[in-house]
Design a protein with these regions (language model features):
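N-terminal beta-alpha supersecondary unit
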Residues: 1-64
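Glycine/Thr-rich phosphate-binding loops of Rossmann-like dinucleotide-binding domains
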Residues: 14, 70, 168-169
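Generic recognition of short, well-ordered alpha-helical segments
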Residues: 38, 73-74, 171-172
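Short amphipathic alpha-helical face segments that pack within enzyme cores
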Residues: 38-41, 77, 81, 98
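DPxDG-like acidic metal-binding loop motif
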Residues: 59-90
Length: 186
């Protein structure tokens, strides 16, 4: 199976092409939310480098949020267009689950995505399983959310966020995301 995966839901753009379990080509870069200026040229370059044309993709996948509304629209529009043109299915993935999937934690993974006005999108995951549905929390509520997760699970909660509030236990996201590997779980 061949598939194209993109993530435009955050500052970092990710594009990957995979054949079965083999990553043929991938690209990840902080594009400062300028995905529309970079996405198509990066897809074109990766298709050429991989030797796997879009017409040979078995499906197209992208992150459907939460995250940057405009970024999500760019990603969804791109994969839906490819899906219609090549008559192939389109898959979407929750951005929070994907961030948690890619990090091994000795407890509960709590990915955060910055929202507006000091708020965060967050969820809680243990070994790829959702413990708490994605939600938006105020910055002041975050510590309460983490303590609640720890109390319910009996395990420490680790925040996955670049930077993040001080004084909380956290893991840095991988420097090079392995988002494409989560496709096996879909």
């Amino acid at each position: 199976m061949n598939y194209l995966v993109i993530d435009t839901s955050s500052r970092c753009l990710y594009v990957g092409i995979r054949r079965g379990k083999e990553v043929l080509e991938d690209f990840s870069q902080d594009c400062s939310l300028q995905h529309s200026q970079v996405l198509i040229s990066k897809i074109d370059a990766l298709v050429k480098e991989s030797g796997c044309p879009l017409a040979e993709m078995d499906y197209f996948a992208c992150c459907a949020g939460p995250g940057s509304f405009t970024g999500i629209r760019i990603g969804l529009t791109t994969v839906r267009a490819f899906g219609q043109i090549f008559q192939k299915p389109v898959l979407t993935v929750n951005s929070l689950w994907l961030k948690a999937y890619n990090v091994e934690a000795a407890g509960v993974a709590v990915p955060l995505i910055g929202a507006v006005r000091g708020k965060f999108y967050c969820g809680a995951y243990l070994n790829g399983k959702e413990l708490e549905k994605p939600r938006m929390v105020e910055s002041a509520e975050l510590e309460i959310f983490l303590k609640d997760i720890e109390q319910k699970s009996g395990l420490p909660a680790y925040v996955i966020y670049e930077g993040g509030p001080d004084g909380i236990r956290r893991l840095e996201p991988p420097k090079k995301p392995f988002y494409i590997e989560a496709c096996d779980e879909l």
